[in-house]
């Protein structure tokens, strides 16, 4: 025969012993606070304490002390109360900290409860938001008829769309009250505004901000007349509002108007008309030209997916496909694909006076080394390396018709290039157009300049 009350009574007795500091054989230090508890309760409640107390099971007569700095004292207080009472005090402020501490202490039940609490809180928030949206939709649906320029769902009454356009135009010209505010009928729905909560009103006010002018030049008696405005130019619907005789003051307060000069209103209409005309012309031009006939703003490489905005950049990019190196060094004859690479090579190698051998990386001079050529590339080798490899392996004579670059002190001056095919150009960044029948050479990516080795 099971007695369910025995478990709760046993927990209450243990909790009372803990609070009175009776038979407590484990001390927990957190942020200068000391928590006293029983080993058996900690061992049975937490996987971390189970592992910790199992290691110190030999010292049964002495109290065990543990220090934690990964969570706060308030968090451990809530967890310790849960161990002795089975009740977890969760709130939106401490649920994350408690779940983190429970994860550290290996308390799976507490982690599950925290996850359920977070999920239920999110569900409640979703329901509240859905309910708020439903209330807003109902209010706006019931209050679609309003006297104003904007549709905010606060208007009252049912209006008749039967006024001719001539009467409205005459009213707008003769009346000193510009009907840009709201005119409401409070006798139809006297308590509709009170049914909306304060949060709903704030949210609606945030999404529908209307200029709030305290009053207009109209008197309360003038507001008792018919307030007719043109609601939409597309449908031609006219709104008519009749206010009762017994609510002059409330009508005067609710029917807020924005005083705007008629000249400014006409100017706005003229500007809108001009904007429509310009937009129609632009759309007509687009329709005549079509999207395919518009000029392209990018240049695409015919050999890869690279795209550039300038034609000069495309021509420079094509050098990596054709294998051309149109910029040679004047001193050693080494060729480069970019002019800035030649200048950097000349400054770091030749102006520094430290040319190095391409193979052994030793410093060479004009006497101890020579320039050799391998295909379109030229580099310097010392006499020892040339003797090891063989003089016949590399031609060491430079053709006179090879293009040279003059690296003078004035680097801004653009040099003139002489190519084999007789084509001359003064722009080092732009080459002739490359047709689709270009032969692509396989180029080794070892054209970077050699940094001198300082011994």
From Swiss-Prot:
One of its GO terms (molecular function) is zinc ion binding. Keywords: DNA-binding, Metal-binding, Nucleus, Phosphoprotein, Repeat, Transcription, Transcription regulation, Zinc, Zinc-finger. GO terms for cellular component: nucleus. Pfam families: BTB (PF00651). InterPro entries: BTB/POZ_dom, SKP1/BTB/POZ_sf, Znf_C2H2_sf, Znf_C2H2_type, ZnFinger_BTB_dom_contain. It is found in: Nucleus. A zinc finger (C2H2-type) spans 299-321, 327-350. Residues 24-92 form the BTB domain. May be involved in transcriptional regulation. This is Zinc finger and BTB domain-containing protein 8A.2. The lineage of its organism: Eukaryota, Metazoa, Chordata, Craniata, Vertebrata. The gene is zbtb8a.2.
């Amino acid at each position: 025969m099971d007695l369910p009350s025995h478990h709760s009574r046993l927990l209450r007795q243990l909790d009372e012993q803990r609070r009175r500091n009776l038979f407590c054989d484990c001390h927990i230090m957190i942020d200068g606070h000391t928590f006293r508890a029983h080993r058996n309760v900690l061992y049975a409640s937490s996987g971390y304490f189970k592992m910790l107390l199992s290691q110190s099971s030999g010292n049964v007569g002495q109290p065990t002390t543990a220090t934690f700095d990964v969570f706060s004292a308030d968090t451990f207080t809530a967890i310790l109360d849960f161990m002795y009472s089975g009740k977890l005090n969760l709130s939106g402020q401490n649920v994350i900290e408690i779940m983190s501490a429970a994860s550290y202490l290996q308390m799976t039940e507490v982690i599950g409860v925290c996850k359920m609490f977070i999920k239920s809180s999110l569900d409640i928030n979703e329901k509240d938001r859905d309910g708020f949206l439903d209330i807003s939709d109902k209010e706006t649906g019931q209050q679609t008829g309003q006297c104003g320029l904007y549709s905010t769902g606060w208007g009252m009454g049912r209006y008749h769309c039967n006024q001719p356009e001539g009467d409205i135009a005459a009213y707008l010209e003769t009346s000193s009250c510009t009907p840009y505010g709201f005119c409401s009928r409070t006798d139809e729905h006297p308590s509709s505004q009170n049914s909306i909560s304060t949060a709903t009103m704030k949210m609606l006010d945030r999404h529908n901000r209307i200029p709030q002018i305290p009053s207009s030049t109209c008197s309360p008696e003038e507001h008792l007349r018919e307030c007719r405005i043109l609601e939409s130019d597309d449908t031609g619907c006219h709104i008519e509002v009749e206010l009762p005789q017994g609510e002059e003051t409330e009508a005067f307060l609710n029917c807020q108007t924005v005083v705007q000069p008629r000249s400014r209103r006409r100017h706005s209409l003229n500007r809108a008309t001009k904007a429509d005309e310009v937009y129609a012309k632009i759309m007509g031009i687009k329709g005549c030209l079509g999207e395919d006939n518009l000029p392209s703003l990018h240049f695409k490489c015919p050999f890869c997916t690279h795209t550039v905005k300038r034609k000069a950049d495309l021509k420079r990019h094509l050098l990596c496909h054709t294998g051309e190196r149109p910029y040679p060094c004047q001193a050693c004859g080494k060729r480069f694909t970019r002019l800035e690479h030649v200048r950097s090579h000349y400054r770091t190698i030749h102006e520094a006076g430290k040319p190095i051998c391409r193979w052994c990386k030793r410093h060479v001079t004009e006497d101890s080394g020579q320039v050799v050529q391998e295909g379109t590339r030229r580099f310097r080798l010392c006499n020892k390396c040339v003797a090891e490899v063989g003089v016949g392996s590399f031609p060491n004579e430079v053709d006179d018709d090879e293009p040279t670059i003059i690296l003078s002190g004035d680097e801004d001056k653009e040099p003139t290039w002489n190519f084999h095919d007789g084509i001359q150009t003064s722009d080092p960044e732009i080459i002739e157009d490359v047709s689709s029948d270009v032969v692509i050479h396989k180029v080794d990516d070892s054209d970077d300049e050699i940094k001198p080795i300082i011994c």
